Amino acid sequence: MAKLALIEREKKRAKLVAKYAAKRANLKAIIDDQEKSEEERYSARLELQQLPRNANPTRQRNRCAITGRPRGTFRKFGLARNKIREIAFKGEIPGLTKASW
C-alpha cells in the first residue's frame, strides 16, 4: 500500500491539471500559431512558464484506486494487476474470464 501522502499528491495534481487545462491549451495554440507575431508568441511562452508545474499532465502518474501502486496499473480498470487478479478470481468484474486455449 502506497503512503497516503503520495495518493493525495496525485489527486491534487489531477485537480490542477483539470483547472489549468483550457488555459494551457490556449497558450500552446498561440505558441504554435506561426501567423501570430513573435512578441505575442514570446509573451504566451512566458505566461505558460508561470503556470504551476503540477498543472502539466505529463507529471501525473496512474495509480491503483485501491492500493495506490504506481506500476502495473491498467487504465481500463484503474487498478493494479494484483488487485485485478484478486477481484477477477472472485468474479466481481463482469465479463472478465481467465484465458484458456
Swiss-Prot record:
GO biological process, one term: translation
Molecular functions (GO terms): rRNA binding; structural constituent of ribosome
The entry's keywords: Ribonucleoprotein, Ribosomal protein, RNA-binding, rRNA-binding
InterPro entries, A to Z: Ribosomal_uS14, Ribosomal_uS14_bac/plastid
GO cellular component: cytoplasm; small ribosomal subunit
Highest taxon in the source lineage: Bacteria
Entries under SUPFAM superfamilies matching the protein: Glucocorticoid receptor-like (DNA-binding domain) (SSF57716)
Family: Belongs to the universal ribosomal protein uS14 family.
Function statement: Binds 16S rRNA, required for the assembly of 30S particles and may also be responsible for determining the conformation of the 16S rRNA at the A site.
Subunit and partners: Part of the 30S ribosomal subunit. Contacts proteins S3 and S10.
Alphabetical list of HAMAP family matching this protein: Ribosomal_uS14_1
Record-given protein name: Small ribosomal subunit protein uS14
UniProt organism field: Cupriavidus necator (strain ATCC 17699 / DSM 428 / KCTC 22496 / NCIMB 10442 / H16 / Stanier 337)
Gene: rpsN
